[in-house]
Swiss-Prot record:
EC number: 5.2.1.8
Source organism per UniProt: Schistosoma japonicum
Motif stretch (Prevents secretion from ER): 210-213
Pfam families named in the record: Pro_isomerase
Family under the similarity heading: Belongs to the cyclophilin-type PPIase family. PPIase B subfamily.
GO cellular component: endoplasmic reticulum lumen
Phosphoprotein keyword on record: no
Name of the molecule in the record: Peptidyl-prolyl cis-trans isomerase B
GO molecular function: cyclosporin A binding; peptidyl-prolyl cis-trans isomerase activity
Annotated ranges, domain PPIase cyclophilin-type: 35-197
Amino acid sequence: MAVLRVLCGLLLVSILFLGFVLSEGNGPKVTEKVFFDIEVDEQPLGRIIIGLFGKTVPKTVENFKQLSIGTTLKDGRTAAYKGSTFHRVIKSFMIQGGDFTNHDGTGGFSIYGERFPDENFKLKHVGAGWLSMANAGPNTNGAQFFITTTQNPWLDGKHVVFGKVVEGMSVVRQIENMQTDSRDRPVKSVKIANCGHIPVDVPFSVSNTDAAE
């Protein structure tokens, strides 16, 4: 009887451990990371670190990575997120940035040219903290992106998901809760003061859930 109780206990522990492993790493694999150091009206707010899914959407990830590093295109134009702003914020929806030319949602361009096609829609907007491309319709990806602050299934199949916040979701929440005007623009300037690439030595999977707060 005692042996049976021990075996049942071990089985329960195994089931719980398996459930933990699956919940922690049953989603897409992070192959690259980038960081954004955020300032609000020139005052430091904090750092957001985003994991990028280079195996699932390599072209989209490369565009975002190069814009985070900062690059000069063949035509001589500089393309970089550094100094750009989060120009659109909607509570319980998302925060949007990436327009490094006009800073109002009308500009920005990709490393491949003005626009590039939707790579695929394999990944979904399953929760808060997921990174997706903003667009003006099918196959109009440029530089603009958004970070979700809740689950947004109606965006699936329309916007390319390619990353997830792995650190600094509290910074995203602070931006989400900032005062905005009638056009959803933050009243205070929310700027990417610095940004760059963080190498990932060993790719790792993330869970298909909200980013950790």
